Structure formats: structure tokens, C-alpha cells
């Protein structure tokens, strides 16, 4: 039996640093801007004078390109970037809710509120409109529902492409829109603030005064 092939894992790039750089000369990217070709030993000395490391970043260039940077800080930044990317990949996912072409108003409002919440958290969403039995002959109702969803979610998202049929299911995808979500949150916070204000006292200025 053949062994199942697994995809190769990506490894972090490794850099030659300081004494590991054996070529006679290098092109140095200077921290203050610009580049300069110099002997490798001079570049190492320059790095030492600035309490930095000489790091080879483009070994295949002629001559190899190096930069002056703290090697420990470079590795830290790379690790942080990897962690942030993994965190983003974990939190962003596809959420799905199902509808029917004859979904009533209460069910529509309830499910749409959930889709809206998913989008506000930065997730993509898919609304799946399922046609049972002979209801497939009423495809127009599915498209009407898709348009209602698009209008309802337009405050936080954009529809990703046109609604698409696959068998007896109509799929509608939505992408969160950061600017729309920020505006939505501001308006909601303002509405909540106004709702929390105490009611104004009644205006009695127009009432006649009692005769003494």
C-alpha cells in the first residue's frame, strides 16, 4: 500500500548572521537610508559599532544584500507576525444559516440578526435557501429572499457575487465591510445613549394659571 503523501510544512527563513557570512563583499542597507557595497569585514565592524548584527537577507543577489538590525528583535517580529496571522485565520471563518423560500417574517428577522452578528465579528457568511420537494418551481421566491437579505445586511456587509443555484439550494455569500461596521456601531451606540436618557419633564408653560 502506498503511503499517503503529506504537504511539506513551511519553515521559517534562516539567515546567515555576522561571522556566518563568508563572501568577500556585501551590499548593505543602511538604517538611515540608502545602500552601500563594502567589504564584509568592514560591514561587520560597522554593525558592531552600532550594537547591531549584520544579517544576510538576499543571499542570491550579487553581491548578497545585508541589513543592520538586532537579530533577536528580527526573530521576535517574525514570530509575532506568524502568531497574528494564525490568530486572524482562526477567528475568520464561514458561518452559515438556512432559509426556505417561504420563511416567515419572525424566522427571517431572527436568522438575519444572527447573520448580522457574525458579520460584525468579521466572519464571512453564507445564506442557504433550501427548496424542498416541488418548491423548486418557485425559484423567483428564492431570489426575492436573497434580495431582502442583501438589503437587510447592507449596513454591515457587501454581497459577494450573485446568488448561485446548486441543485435545490440557492447560495448567497456576504463579506463584512469594516467601514460599514464601524459606522453601524457608532449609530447603535448613539441610539442606545439616547434611549438611556431620562424623559423630559412635561411642558406646562401653556397651561392657564389658577386664580387665587
UniProtKB/Swiss-Prot annotation:
Signal peptide coordinates: none
Compartments where found: Cytoplasm
Highest taxon above the source species: Bacteria
Region (Disordered): 192-212
GO biological process: ribosome disassembly
One GO CC term, this protein: cytoplasm
Coiled coil segments of this chain: none
UniProt GO MF annotations: ribosome binding; translation initiation factor activity
TM region(s), chain numbering: none
Keywords assigned by UniProt, alphabetized: Cytoplasm, Initiation factor, Protein biosynthesis
Record-stated family: Belongs to the IF-3 family.
Functional summary from the UniProt entry: IF-3 binds to the 30S ribosomal subunit and shifts the equilibrium between 70S ribosomes and their 50S and 30S subunits in favor of the free subunits, thus enhancing the availability of 30S subunits on which protein synthesis initiation begins.
Description of how the protein assembles with itself and partners: Monomer.
Protein name: Translation initiation factor IF-3
Organism this protein belongs to: Chlorobaculum parvum (strain DSM 263 / NCIMB 8327) (Chlorobium vibrioforme subsp. thiosulfatophilum)
Lineage: Bacteria, Pseudomonadati, Chlorobiota, Chlorobiia, Chlorobiales
Amino acid at each position: 500500500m502506498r503511503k499517503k503523501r503529506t504537504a511539506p510544512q513551511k519553515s521559517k527563513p534562516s539567515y546567515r548572521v555576522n561571522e556566518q557570512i563568508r563572501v568577500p563583499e556585501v551590499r548593505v542597507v543602511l538604517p538611515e537610508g540608502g545602500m552601500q557595497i563594502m567589504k564584509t569585514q568592514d560591514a561587520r565592524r560597522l554593525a558592531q559599532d552600532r550594537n547591531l548584527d549584520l544579517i544576510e537577507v538576499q543571499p542570491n543577489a550579487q553581491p548578497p544584500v545585508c541589513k543592520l538590525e538586532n537579530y533577536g528583535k528580527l526573530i521576535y517580529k517574525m514570530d509575532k507576525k506568524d502568531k497574528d496571522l494564525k490568530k486572524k485565520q482562526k477567528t475568520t471563518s464561514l458561518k452559515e444559516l438556512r432559509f426556505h423560500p417561504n420563511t416567515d417574517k419572525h424566522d427571517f428577522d431572527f436568522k438575519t440578526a444572527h447573520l448580522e452578528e457574525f458579520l460584525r465579528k468579521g466572519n464571512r457568511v453564507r445564506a442557504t435557501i433550501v427548496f424542498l420537494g416541488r418548491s423548486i418551481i418557485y425559484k423567483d421566491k428564492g431570489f426575492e429572499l436573497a434580495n431582502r437579505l442583501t438589503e437587510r445586511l447592507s449596513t454591515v456587509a457587501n454581497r459577494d457575487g450573485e446568488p448561485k443555484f446548486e441543485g435545490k439550494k440557492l447560495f448567497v455569500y456576504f463579506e463584512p465591510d469594516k467601514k460599514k461596521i464601524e459606522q453601524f456601531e457608532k449609530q447603535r451606540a448613539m441610539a442606545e445613549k439616547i434611549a438611556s436618557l431620562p424623559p423630559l419633564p412635561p411642558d406646562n408653560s401653556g397651561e392657564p394659571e389658577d386664580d387665587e
